[in-house]
Amino acid sequence: MTPATRAGERPLRILAISGSLRARSSNTSLLRLAVDVAPDDVEIVMYDGLATLPHFNPDDDVDVPPAPVAALRAQVGEADGLLFCSPEYAHGVPGSLKNALDWLVASLELPHKPVALLNASPWATHAQASLVETLTVMSTRIIHEACVTIPVARGDVDADGAIESAEIRQGVRAALDTFAGAIRSRTATRP
């Protein structure tokens, strides 16, 4: 029996956010794999609204923000943790992901939220560091032990965007186990 099934507890809910808008993105494929290999007591939900967010404008960040922004904030608020996987463009994160984070800066949903980062490319170190810096400034709780690089080559992703490599599957599952354990530990120690 898993911890989430004891005494009617709900599974941990993790929101997975890909920094890529590409249809066959290795980053999105890695997050979809996380959905497939997640422990039974962990529910991973893919965020699919990145392309629908308007460009961030503080003048539009009002009591009733644009609907896609409100939806993003609601999903972040409902999540026990956030799982990011992003490509690197010009030594940084893609503008679409940074835009989403900008919409979360003034919201109350993000501070102290546990975060883990998957990196699908061993060469995307600048984006990973940039994302860590941005999320740290935004007062998230980065679980460094669950932040891992799991190289995904083009040949690892099939025509449907699935990854079947046992090694990659095991790496993602290990990161999720670490992340879920850290979230539960944090929840158990709250006053």
Residue ranges and their predicted role:
Residues 6-41:
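N-terminal beta1-alpha1 ligand-phosphate binding loop
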Residues 38-45, 141-142:
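A generic structural motif
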Residues 2-15, 141-191:
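Glycine-rich phosphate/pyrophosphate-binding loop and the adjoining helix
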Residues 49-66, 156-158:
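N-terminal beta-loop-helix "entrance" segment that forms/cooperates
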Residues 14, 27-31, 69, 94-97, ...:
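A general structural signal for well-ordered alpha-helical segments in protein cores
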Residues 64-139:
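Helix-loop-strand module that forms the ligand-binding subsite of alpha/beta enzymes
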